[in-house]
Regions:
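Active-site rim elements
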Residues: 67-74, 92, 115-118
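Alpha-helical packing segments of well-folded alpha/beta enzyme cores
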Residues: 73-80, 128
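Long hydrophobic alpha-helical segments typical of transmembrane helices together
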Residues: 124-144
């Protein structure tokens, strides 16, 4: 039995052990560096401000919430999503075909929007979220 508790590590482990070469570019592919970058960008750059927003607006009791923390996190999240928007210009998925990087980044973008991040000025992010969420497996996962 194996226990892994970080989502990026879980995605890498599952794809390495059970992916059969699917859902990630091969290491010699031109898409592989982008795949790695965005696989880790989701948890390293998008999710920290998301987590701050969750803590400050949902988890903390009202008397302990700090609006300034939410404002800073919201601004940071907008910048992080702007980078995704720029990368997604002319692309359907992060690194060519749908991959583990899209599992991570698509989820981070979706959660950001569901928490109220304004993506109306980020049309590539908006379209990317819609594409990811239109995938049958993800539709099924959201119902569990």
């Amino acid at each position: 039995d194996v226990t892994i508790f970080e989502s990026g590590a879980i995605v890498e482990y599952v794809l390495s052990r059970h992916g059969g070469g699917r859902m990630r570019p091969s290491p010699d592919s031109a898409d592989f560096p982008s795949y790695l970058q965005w696989l880790h960008y989701a948890e390293g750059m998008i999710m920290p401000p998301v987590n701050t927003i969750v803590v400050e607006t949902i988890l903390l009791p009202p008397e302990r919430r700090n609006d300034e923390n939410v404002n800073r996190a919201t601004k940071l999240l907008s910048r992080m999503l702007q980078a995704v928007d720029a990368h997604m210009e002319g692309r359907e998925y992060i690194a060519g075909e749908f991959s583990g990087a899209d599992i991570m980044t698509g989820h981070a973008c979706t959660v950001s929007k569901r928490l109220g991040a304004d993506v109306s000025d980020k049309p590539n992010v908006e379209a990317y979220i819609e594409r990811c969420n239109a995938r049958p497996a993800l539709k099924k996962a959201w119902t569990v």
